[in-house]
Amino acid sequence: MKKPASEPKKCGATTGDLGEGAHRAWGALLRSHAHFVERIERKLSAQGALSPEAYDVLLMLSYAPNHRLRMGELYETATLSRSGLTRLVDRLEKEGWVKREVCPNDRRSFEAVLTASGEAARARSWPLYAQAIAREFGHFFDEKEAHTLADLLERPLGKGESEAQV
């Protein structure tokens, strides 16, 4: 008599051990991220477009109510360290794309506020950014594979955390 099939064991779910699949996936994720970001940044830089980090900050502000976020809230959505985000916001402020304002509810905090010229810079960069993503990343996957990959990568983030689109 055949044993009933058991559920597949999740990597490290009970023992803390890292399975071969999880180890391989983690390494591939890190290498792929570095590979694609470097190639896309190079293309964008050659075309005089915003960096992916600058674009993402401007995008998060464009989605925010009244186009403003506290610096702490912006940090939670950014892919930079706190000091890296502060330096980036400094640069965006010098360009006139973002301004800092004292938070009306907490005078100890600052909000980053998207300016009209910041939104225009983001909008100008999007076609170049989309083209670079398509050329450097998108052509590796058909539409179904891209959705599957997105679903898998979004799973650890939990529902709602991945809703902001590039």
Give the ranges of each region predicted by the language model.
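Charged, amphipathic alpha-helical coiled-coil/dimerization segments
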Residues: K2-P4, P8-G12, D90-T148
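N-terminal helix-turn-helix DNA-binding core of bacterial DNA-binding proteins
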Residues: E38-S81, Q165
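N-terminal leader segment of winged-helix/HTH proteins
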Residues: M1-G48
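Short, hydrophobic-biased segments on the C-terminal half of alpha helices
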Residues: M71, V89-D90
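C-terminal regulatory/oligomerization modules of transcriptional regulators
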Residues: M1-E20, E143-V166
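Alpha-helical linker/hinge and terminal dimerization helices associated
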Residues: F36, I40, A78, A121-F140, ...
